Structures are given as C-alpha cells and as structure tokens.
C-alpha cells in the first residue's frame, strides 16, 4: 500500500525564529497523525537547522527546495546532498515550476538533480506540470509525457515522488478539478510503469479541498505552498479525512 506524503514548500518564507515558533505550534497538531501518512516540510536553507535541532523531529521529515548534481565545486548559490544530509534532510524538491520559469531549468538538469539525489541517499520530489496556454491548446498530456520521460530517466521509482503541479493553479486560487488531476496522476503512474510510485498533486491545495483531493485513487499526497505557512491550516491538510 502506498503511503501518503503531505509536503509543505515554504519557498522564500520564514526566518529561523519564525520557523521555531511555527514548529512549537504545529507539532502538537500532528502528533496523532495516521501511520499511513508522512509529513514533510521544505523550509528555506537557512531554517533547515531549526528543524534538525528540534526535539520533536520524529514527527516530520525535512526536504530541501533544490539540490545540485555535484557534491562540491564552483556552483554559486547551489547546495549539495552532502551538505543537506548533515542536517537530517531526507527529501529534495526538484524541477519546481518556479526554477523552471525564472531560471530556465531544463528537463536534462532536473534529471541530473533527481538521479544524483537518489544516488546520495535522498528521495527526490520531482515536479511536472503544464502552463495554462499548454492546457488550453490541448497539450497537457504531451508536456507531462515529455517531462516524465526526460526528467525521470534512469531514476529508481521505488525511491521517488512525483508531484503534478499544473502551473496555472499555483498560487492563483484556481484548483484543478480533482477528477482531472487524478487522470494526469494516473497517466504519470502508467508512464513510470511502477504501481507503487508516490504521486502528489500541487496547486492551491487548501483545508477546504484537501479531503476531495485525497479521495482520488491515484493521488497519494499533496505538495502545498501558501497554505503550509500557517500551522493550523497545514495541520488540517495533514490530518485530512
């Protein structure tokens, strides 16, 4: 049975002091969480140590928001798996739509990050998704297929999470209909060819739509942005019914 993974991506939010205050409020809210699910938070790099030093660390796992494909070198602004593992990081978000958009990150680069994350002992959360223009032109399936085939080449599906995040739904308040999201997640599972791969949905996930999203057969979790910044909101998402 696939375990549900509820992940919060804080992006460029939260200082160390704010993260500490957040955890103090959040952790009691998830202490009784079902054993069939895992909670993950991806804080800014500067706040990772706040998580790894927290006494109640057992209740959730840490993810980085990106990762490089080398352990060291002249790669300004990048971070390596070796550096992250020192701080108890277990996951790494790869290929999020924002690096794809703002830094022109390619499927080839995303693949290198994902493969190296796995070889270093981390589980990559590889993001895929179409733009509004691509969706309106009927190109969503073609785009997702390309991103999966090129971005996941030579990866181990047993140590992998794929997050379907339709770009037009991120931070816009627009949510992909649960049935439509489930169809894309089913497509991703078929493309990978491994029934037990964990597939998340991301895109304006909130407390008022989490129960419907998680009732879908091919959605195994969510990648949450803005709603993960409030401890009560994210706890409600983690404790979905």
Swiss-Prot record:
It holds the Pfam family TIM. Involved in the gluconeogenesis. Catalyzes stereospecifically the conversion of dihydroxyacetone phosphate (DHAP) to D-glyceraldehyde-3-phosphate (G3P). GO terms for biological process: gluconeogenesis; glyceraldehyde-3-phosphate biosynthetic process; glycerol catabolic process; glycolytic process. NCBIfam families: tim. One of its GO terms (cellular component) is cytosol. CDD domains: TIM (cd00311). Pathway: Carbohydrate biosynthesis; gluconeogenesis; Carbohydrate degradation; glycolysis; D-glyceraldehyde 3-phosphate from glycerone phosphate: step 1/1. Transmembrane segments: none annotated. It comes from Prochlorococcus marinus (strain AS9601). Belongs to the triosephosphate isomerase family. It is found in: Cytoplasm. Its EC number is 5.3.1.1. The active site is at residues 96, 165. PANTHER family: TRIOSEPHOSPHATE ISOMERASE. This is Triosephosphate isomerase. It catalyses: D-glyceraldehyde 3-phosphate = dihydroxyacetone phosphate. GO terms for molecular function: triose-phosphate isomerase activity. Homodimer. Keywords: Cytoplasm, Gluconeogenesis, Glycolysis, Isomerase. Substrate binds at residues 9-11, 171, 204, 225-226. InterPro entries: Aldolase_TIM (IPR013785), TIM_sf (IPR035990), TrioseP_Isoase_bac/euk (IPR022896), Triosephosphate_isomerase (IPR000652), Triosephosphate_isomerase_AS (IPR020861).
């Amino acid at each position: 049975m696939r375990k549900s993974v509820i992940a919060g991506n804080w992006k460029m939010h939260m200082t160390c002091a704010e993260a500490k205050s957040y955890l103090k409020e959040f952790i009691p809210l998830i202490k009784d969480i079902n054993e069939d699910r895992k909670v993950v938070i991806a804080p800014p790099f500067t706040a990772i140590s706040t998580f790894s030093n927290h006494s109640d660390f057992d209740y959730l796992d840490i993810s980085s928001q990106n990762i490089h494909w080398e352990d060291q070198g002249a790669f300004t602004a990048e971070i390596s798996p070796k550096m992250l593992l020192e701080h108890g990081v277990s996951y790494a978000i790869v290929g999020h739509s924002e690096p794809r958009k703002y830094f022109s990150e390619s499927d080839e680069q995303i693949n290198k990050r994902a493969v190296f994350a796995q070889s270093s002992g981390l589980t990559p959360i590889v993001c895929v998704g179409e733009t509004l223009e691509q969706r309106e032109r009927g190109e969503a399936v073609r785009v997702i297929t390309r991103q999966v085939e090129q971005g996941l080449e030579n990866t181990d599906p047993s140590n992998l999470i794929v997050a379907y995040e339709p770009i037009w739904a991120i931070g816009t308040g627009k949510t992909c209909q649960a049935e439509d999201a489930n169809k894309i997640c089913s497509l991703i599972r078929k493309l990978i060819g491994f029934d037990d791969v964990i597939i998340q949905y991301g895109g304006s996930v909130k407390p008022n739509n989490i129960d419907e999203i998680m009732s879908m057969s091919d959605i195994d979790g969510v990648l949450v942005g803005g709603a993960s910044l409030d401890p009560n909101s994210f706890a409600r998402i983690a404790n979905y019914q």
